[in-house]
Amino acid sequence: MLSRRGHRLSRFRKNKRRLRERLRQRIFFRDKVVPEAMEKPRVLVLTGAGISAESGIRTFRAADGLWEEHRVEDVATPEGFDRDPELVQTFYNARRRQLQQPEIQPNAAHLALAKLQDALGDRFLLVTQNIDNLHERAGNTNVIHMHGELLKVRCSQSGQVLDWTGDVTPEDKCHCCQFPAPLRPHVVWFGEMPLGMDEIYMALSMADIFIAIGTSGHVYPAAGFVHEAKLHGAHTVELNLEPSQVGNEFAEKYYGPASQVVPEFVEKLLKGL
């Protein structure tokens, strides 16, 4: 007879197997892929700020990055929001307005990844650290925003997420709860858990090819994805302006502007399919 602990362990293992199967189907087999499509590789792409820099989105870690104007602790932590929500909302309102300027458009790198998804279908997954919507505007649909999305807000009490394109003020409240609660940016701040991690790690365990684009290799857990992918046998590729902090982990590397190296690599990959 199983002990209570044994029952819990058995139930945990069954639930884990079920989760793995659900995620596997969600990521790569949503439309019951036909047999000939099975020959196509499962490709997992990670993008960082470098892919959007050429579209005019300022990066966080560059010399002229956003943190020049504000301390990280003031605008990108839960504690900063608690201290001065108006400052935090003003900061993200400016970023939101910038993103919606007509000159901010997907560049050739974004468009190349949309083309890659078109070729691979549900055997393609894009994970981005960026909070802009340039991947979606380029045509990508299978996207996980692990650090949140700038054009969304969420209830600070229930966590309910809402689409939001305008400014947010301290007077704006979410009415999904019994008592109206303040809205906060739908952005993962320092000290908070990134979004979609179960799905991401499942995809890493199944990927045939892992490609990192425009990432610094400074921020974990994303900086550790290449190691995780290698453990499961994936071929790893870095496409970056310069070698990242984890550049030596990659089997294949190409350096230059994202708008140049990403389309070139995608064309090379598509020719091999």
From Swiss-Prot:
SUPFAM superfamilies assigned to the protein according to its UniProt record, in alphabetical order: DHS-like NAD/FAD-binding domain
Residue positions binding Zn(2+): 155, 174
Binding sites annotated in the UniProt record for NAD(+): 48-67, 129-132, 214-216, 240-242, 258
Gene Ontology molecular function terms on file: histone deacetylase activity, NAD-dependent; NAD+ binding; NAD-dependent protein de-2-hydroxyisobutyrylase activity; protein-malonyllysine demalonylase activity; protein-succinyllysine desuccinylase activity; zinc ion binding
One Pfam entry name: SIR2
Localisation per UniProt entry: Cytoplasm
InterPro entries membership: DHS-like_NAD/FAD-binding_dom, NAD-dep_sirtuin_deacylases, Sirtuin, Sirtuin_cat_small_dom_sf, Sirtuin_class_III, Ssirtuin_cat_dom
HAMAP family recorded: Sirtuin_ClassIII
Family: Belongs to the sirtuin family. Class III subfamily.
Known function: NAD-dependent lysine deacetylase that specifically removes acetyl groups on target proteins. Also acts as a protein-lysine deacylase by mediating protein desuccinylation and de-2-hydroxyisobutyrylation. Modulates the activities of several proteins which are inactive in their acylated form.
Domain notes: 2 residues (Tyr-92 and Arg-95) present in a large hydrophobic pocket are probably involved in substrate specificity. They are important for desuccinylation activity, but dispensable for deacetylation activity.
Protein name: NAD-dependent protein deacylase
Organism: Escherichia coli O6:H1 (strain CFT073 / ATCC 700928 / UPEC)
